[in-house]
Amino acid sequence: GMPLEHHSSSVSVEVVGAGAESSTIRLNHCNAITLGGSTIVFEPELYGSFSPEFTLSDLGKDAADGGVYIAITASYDRLIPVGYPDPNEIPLRHPHLLPEIRITAVPVQSGNEHFLNKDFVIIGKGLLEGHGFVLDDEYIPPVQRLAYSQKLRTSLNSTIVHLNHMEDCIGQIYQKNVDDSRRSTLTSNVFTLCRAIDEYYAHQFFQIENILIEEPPIRYLQSINILARSIFNALRTIPNKEYEYMLQYFYEWTEISPSSFETTVGDVLSLKYNHLDIAKTDRVIQRLVTTLDAIIKKMSELDYIGLIRENIIISDDSNTEQER
């Protein structure tokens, strides 16, 4: 769910204790929704002295060796009395009842997406590191919408920045090269790449900028998969030798090797979405947009496509690199 008031994240956990087996996972706050539609809300102000905790010794070191998913559940058949008793009421009693919230750990090797069909929510991941247990800061818990994850919001904003920058740079590439007398086959092939990105931008950018934030993470991958597929299909129309020359040309100016470029595009096309491993999806997406942006940016900075990068001379005066 969305972060509660006065919190920047929907959920917060911490690890207390020094040793691996003596470490305790403690829930600080959360606002989550299970697939069944049940809400799990925990705030210390609501629950008073009750604090959901789980000690790793209950799981066993061997089970935790491969890492664990941290999960929470709300037991509506086990209620916690909360609130301040009315001194005028006899017998004294707490005025409210809230469901007991429990936190537990599931070995990663035992976890799969079937766990998401139960009435609990995975909120984090932990790893044994040295003699202690640490939270995986890179892990992105399953969320219903990108808006519910700070990491995914940041990733989407980064993608939007890269796409906008590429669109500006593509305009510069066209301006410099479309009427240039030095226009070559290489120029036309770079235009092919630019058009693939351009067409994707025209058809997808409104959705990315305005709608995707309210969509599940798989829609994010779907959108970037369309970009990768557009590029892959466009580049297939270039004869092999010309295609290889273009990738080598990119390599000369950006140090992005042909194999790295092809792997980056291929990783997006082949990735199978895993709701328990959203961080992998995010890494693959960011690698593609940053790689494309670096190439397009450099091509836009050249006087014309086809300019050859000759030997680099190191200036004795300034230690800066200059093209001959």
What are these regions (language model features)?
Residues 29-31, 68-73, 121-125:
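Ordered hydrophobic segments in well-structured contexts
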Residues 42, 81-82, 135-137:
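Short helix/loop capping segments that flank catalytic or ligand/cofactor-binding pockets
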Residues 37-58:
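Hydrophobic-cavity lipid-handling domains and compact docking modules
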Residues 211-324:
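Extended, amphipathic alpha-helical scaffolds
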Residues 90-225:
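Mixed-charge (acidic/basic) macromolecular-recognition segments
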Residues 1-40:
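N-terminal "first-domain core" detector
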Residues 51-86:
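Elongated alpha-helical scaffolds
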Residues 44-47, 82-98:
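"Short basic amphipathic alpha-helical interaction patches in structured regions
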